[in-house]
Amino acid sequence: MIGMLRGKVWEIQADKLILDVQGVGYQLSIPYGLLGKAHPGHELILYTHVILREDELALYGFSSAAEKELFLLMLSVSGIGPKAALSILSTLGIGQTESAIASENITLLTKVPGIGKKTAQRLILELKEKFKGRAIALEGIEGAGSLPQAAFHSEAMETLLALGFSQEEAKKALQALPDSAQALSTEEQVRLALRSLAATK
């Protein structure tokens, strides 16, 4: 099974890209957020998942292990296929998806193309308990109602928690970021947050 690929972007298509790995081109479906950042010749490391069907082998790529894990969790829900799971990640990102499920926010989930009320209810019913703690960690982050900002902040929050900071420390550091940080990558947001944390030590 292919668990990870490292290579250069060869071609970008409507909803896929081709990754050149030592002369072999792998076609992967990836979230739109990642697709928008990819450029031909740019090196990417993707966490991957393979889905085998009778007439097709489909490869999906993700920017982090957490993104892949969420994709697989959604696939475990009855009625959620890879297209729907990828659409949710593309529209909401990791943080907003987890927060919407944990808070039973059907309205937000049904904003995703192809996700109706019944599908949103199934997602909530089967997955909400898994995300209760993570939703608490996201509470109080400035701009949490904004899809792009919350998505960036949630991934930065997860990174800071993984580095050993408490929820309170991470939350305060992210709240202190300027509004312009919304346009930054997760790595850049984490770097700014770490500077803020170092200054308070």
From Swiss-Prot:
Residues 64-142 are annotated as: Domain II. Residues 143-153 are annotated as: Flexible linker. One of its GO terms (biological process) is DNA repair. Residues 153-201 are annotated as: Domain III. It comes from the Bacteria. Its main location: cytoplasm. This is Holliday junction branch migration complex subunit RuvA. It comes from Desulfitobacterium hafniense (strain Y51). The lineage of its organism: Bacteria, Bacillati, Bacillota, Clostridia, Eubacteriales. The gene is ruvA.
